[in-house]
């Protein structure tokens, strides 16, 4: 039995296995857990804060305002909205359920079949994890396994993600043209201009995240924490804002910023440091330009402090722009029932509920991801202690016969099969450990290898018979699950074509020459 001999290993004792899995960095406490603690939790928390702020609802309404009146408008709105939401949630099923509850009924009402409506939603929802800049949890594993800066991963993933979503847009357009499906009437949609004026600030956290990662080139962890602080400060400012308080809000922010910069320029210490005993330095400690840059970096803290003072001074004032997630409003209402207080109608109470609900939601989501990542750490640990990695590599190369195309097909099939019913992070870890060292031997760029695995693994969410995202969409659409999954698989075929394209043409990933030659 040649195959059996290929997987033969030396005899191992249980104490050796336990030692390797639990007390070394090659097992459960290896790279995946390290990444989940340092990076993944931070960005899951950021996604929770942004979603609870009401950004999720705003992005969905924005998608309908932009595309709703076009041919096949509801389906096109689903493509745009699910891309935004999937980028934040990092879960195909959660994204399908969240956005599908709004988009699928509208698609059915406009003339799409229930199966097609569910297929569109599940397909684009599973693709949300490939959309920069957040890209779900797997992006941070790519950073750690490849040693590629996060900004380079974001840049490389942009064109393939655009290609996938553009392909989905084209397919729903052709289906609308075939069925004669038009768009929604303008009276059913929010006015784009007024909608932007009421919620443009939801774009600020994403813009700041890109600035911190791509331009300022901060570490991933610091960029994440600073963006979370900025999101909390933004919601605090929105809660504190109304016509009566706006002069105090903006005046206080300007005064705080000026005081911060002046203190740094004159003493080298911030006002808080001086307040708690930092000694002033004679003469200017930093240049004016450096002081302004430092004050700008600390602007979210100033905004949060001024806004909280106004909220505490007038907790029941109006907040015309505050439109938090329904989960936050419900949580505040439950507090009212239990305590007999009127927190739901208080802007200060709603802000407090927002912070607590976001922390609760982020912690619950992170727990699920971290547990899955810990479990996935068993696989590389076992492969390392048994030495199966080399045997698997030799077997895969032998089966492929040295053909790169056949090797990629085998890798894609493995990613789809392993990914069925599994979180994306677990699938990615297993496939990268098994196949990651093999593909670069054929001259494939390391980043292309890891993005290839991510793309093909996401296909599992819409591939029969498991197709968890398609099942979730079928439940909302009240359609046949298998027919919905079949349609979703066909719609997602460009999720297979795109990774093959950037493997053979690394220029799609905007890789520099030295990056194309990198190996694991």
Question: What residues fall within each predicted segment?
Answer:
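Membrane-interface helix-loop-helix modules in multi-pass membrane proteins
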Residues: 1-52, 69, 83, 87-88
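Membrane-interfacial helical/loop segments at transmembrane boundaries in membrane proteins
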Residues: 3-26, 267-293, 389-398, 403, ...
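Short, membrane-interfacial amphipathic segments enriched in basic
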Residues: 13-19, 52-57, 334-353, 382-386
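Membrane-interfacial loop-to-helix junctions in multi-pass transporters
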Residues: 26-39, 66-78, 110-116, 197-204, ...
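Hydrophobic alpha-helical transmembrane segments in multi-pass membrane proteins
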Residues: 39, 43, 73-74, 82, ...
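Hydrophobic transmembrane alpha-helices
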Residues: 46-49, 84-85, 126-131, 372, ...
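Hydrophobic transmembrane alpha-helices that form the pore/transport pathway of multi-pass ion
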Residues: 60-128, 134, 138-139, 147, ...
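Long, contiguous bundles of hydrophobic transmembrane helices that form the permeation core
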Residues: 155-364, 468-520
């Amino acid at each position: 039995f040649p195959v059996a001999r290929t997987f033969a290993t030396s005899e191992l004792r249980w104490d050796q296995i336990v030692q390797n899995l639990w007390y070394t960095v090659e097992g459960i406490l290896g790279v995946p857990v390290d990444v989940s603690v340092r990076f993944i939790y931070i960005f899951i928390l950021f996604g929770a804060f942004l979603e609870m702020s009401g950004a999720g609802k705003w992005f969905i309404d924005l998608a309908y305002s932009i595309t709703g009146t076009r041919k096949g408008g509801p389906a096109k709105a689903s493509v745009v909205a699910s891309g935004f939401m999937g980028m934040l949630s990092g879960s195909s099923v959660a994204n399908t359920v969240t956005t599908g509850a709004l988009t699928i009924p509208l698609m059915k009402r406009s003339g799409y079949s229930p199966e097609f409506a569910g297929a569109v939603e599940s397909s684009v929802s599973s693709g949300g994890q490939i959309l920069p800049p957040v890209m779900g949890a797997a992006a941070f594993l790519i950073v750690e396994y490849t040693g590629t800066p996060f900004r380079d991963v974001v840049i490389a993933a942009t064109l393939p993600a655009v290609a996938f979503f553009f392909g989905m847009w084209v397919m729903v357009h052709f289906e609308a043209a075939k069925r004669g499906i038009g768009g929604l009437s303008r009276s059913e949609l929010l006015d784009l201009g007024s909608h932007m004026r009421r919620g443009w600030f939801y774009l600020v956290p994403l813009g700041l995240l890109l600035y911190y990662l791509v331009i300022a080139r901060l570490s991933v962890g610091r960029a994440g924490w600073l963006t979370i602080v900025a999101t909390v400060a933004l919601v605090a400012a929105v809660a504190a804002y109304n016509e009566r308080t706006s002069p105090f809000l903006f005046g206080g922010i300007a005064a705080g910023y000026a005081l911060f910069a002046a203190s740094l320029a004159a003493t080298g210490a911030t006002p808080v440091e001086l307040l708690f005993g930092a000694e002033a330095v004679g003469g200017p400690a930093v240049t004016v330009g450096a002081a302004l840059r430092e004050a700008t970096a600390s602007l979210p803290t100033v905004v949060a402090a001024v806004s909280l003072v106004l909220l505490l001074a007038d907790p029941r004032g109006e907040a015309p722009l505050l439109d938090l997630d329904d989960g936050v409003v419900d949580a505040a209402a439950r507090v009212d029932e239990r305590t007999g207080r009127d927190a739901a109608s208080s802007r200060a109470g709603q802000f407090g509920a927002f912070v607590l609900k976001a922390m609760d939601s982020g912690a619950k989501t992170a727990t699920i991801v971290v547990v899955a990542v810990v479990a996935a750490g068993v696989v590389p640990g076992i492969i390392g202690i048994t030495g199966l990695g080399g045997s698997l590599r030799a077997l895969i190369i032998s089966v492929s016969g040295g053909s790169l195309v056949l090797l990629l097909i085998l890798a894609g099939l493995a990613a789809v099969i392993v990914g069925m019913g599994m979180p994306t992070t677990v699938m990615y870890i297993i496939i990268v450990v098994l196949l990651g060292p093999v593909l670069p031997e054929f001259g494939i760029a390391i980043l292309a290898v890891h993005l290839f695995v991510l793309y093909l693994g996401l296909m599992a969410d819409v591939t029969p018979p498991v197709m968890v995202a398609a099942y979730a969409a079928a439940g909302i659409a009240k359609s046949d699950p298998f027919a919905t999954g079949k349609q979703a698989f066909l719609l997602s075929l460009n999720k297979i074509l795109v990774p093959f394209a950037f493997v053979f043409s690394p220029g799609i990933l905007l890789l520099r020459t030295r990056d194309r030659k990198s190996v694991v």
